[in-house]
Amino acid sequence: MPSALVLVHDAVPGRGEREVGTVGPALAELGFDVLVTAFQPGAPPVPDPGDVDVIVVMGSADAAYDDTVPWLGAELDLLARAVGHGTPVLGICFGAQALARVLGGTVARAPRSERGFVALGSADPDVLERGTWMQFHDDAFTLPSGAQQLARNEVGLQAFVCGPHVAVQFHPEITPDAFAAWLDAWDEAGERAALEAAVDIPALVADIAARADVTEAACRRLVGRFCARAGVTAS
């Protein structure tokens, strides 16, 4: 059975697993043994990237360019070793930014935040289909040398592919429960009031629920194409 490492960035036990959304089930349906963990005290040990078949790096409230984040150095080192070993990495939002940084790109504050569902094209539908994807980010990244741009809009680069690695700025994994976990984290951090001043949270919650079936199917296809392209299957 192939193995998948899914890295989350929440210190609260159980909440990181909720934030994985549809990515975990998509990998399980493909026959992967899925380990969800984090560089956090009390989390299961993070395996060596050479001991797993694929790695998925999820989003984070922290910035991939903020070297004061306690666990960031360890995670960037793991991704660098994964790239060196040839272990395919799928980076989602923060994960895409971290992957871009490891591959030689840069990460910085975006010209503006993106919140909600955004329609994106694709330079290669065999990797990333054209569609409407949920965005929730403040940062942006540049295209690493040797990578192929998959999607871009007026805010910046939205997706790229580099060898077996795929990076997407948006959140294909989003579900009502995953977003509820985000809300819990924002409440705990005292950030929800500021977000509600900038975003119509009830409307976004309703939109996520209304699109849940379509979003889940699109995530399954994205994960399936990533694994197939990397040549990692249960068979």
Spell out what each predicted region is.
Residues 1-85, 196-235:
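N-terminal beta1-alpha1 cap of cysteine-dependent amidohydrolase-like domains
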Residues 3-7, 108, 122-235:
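Amide-donor transfer/coupling interface in amidating biosynthetic enzymes
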Residues 16-17, 46, 66-68, 100-102, ...:
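Short glycine-/acidic-enriched loop or helix-start segments at secondary-structure transitions
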Residues 18, 97, 115, 142, ...:
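Short alpha-helical
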Residues 41-45, 115-117, 141, 157-159:
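A short acidic, often aromatic-flanked loop/helix-cap motif at beta-alpha or helix-coil junctions
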Residues 50, 113, 145:
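Structured loop/turn residues at beta-strand edges in well-structured enzyme cores
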Residues 57-124:
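Cysteine-nucleophile active-site neighborhood
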